[in-house]
Amino acid sequence: GAAPDKPTLIFMHHPPFETGIWWMDSLGILDGLDRLATVLGRHRQVVGMTAGHLHRTIHATFAGVPVTVAPTTCYAVDLDIHDEALPKVTDEPSAMMLHYWHVDTLVSHTLFLDAHETYDVTGLMKDWPGRFERMRQRQPMPKALGSIE
């Protein structure tokens, strides 16, 4: 509340919503969510929330605020949203999120940590130097120049 005009992020361990993974939800902070929603309603400068606990990427909203749940850096909680689902983990790839504030927008990227190849596609494009300059200047890309040939 000390800086109501400054965009603010909230980081917390447990997500402020039910995920559908009952056995993880039962370990969360489901009590008091109405009070948290009231606080967020008074603080419109909160532009995003990030949580963990679930070991899997989830996107939702709570009280009108976008919420991301960070992916796993070790094992992932198995995505099984049936009421009788047994608690399980899986060996999905490890990942992390990078949150980037750009002008007036929160941008969140997910980066997989396992080794993977990258490929330079500039050799497949006509007039790469011209395209590069247009992109750097944030100019619209004519459709004929926007495709890979």
Regions inferred by a protein language model and the residue ranges of each:
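Binuclear metal-dependent phosphoesterase catalytic core
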Residues: I58-E149
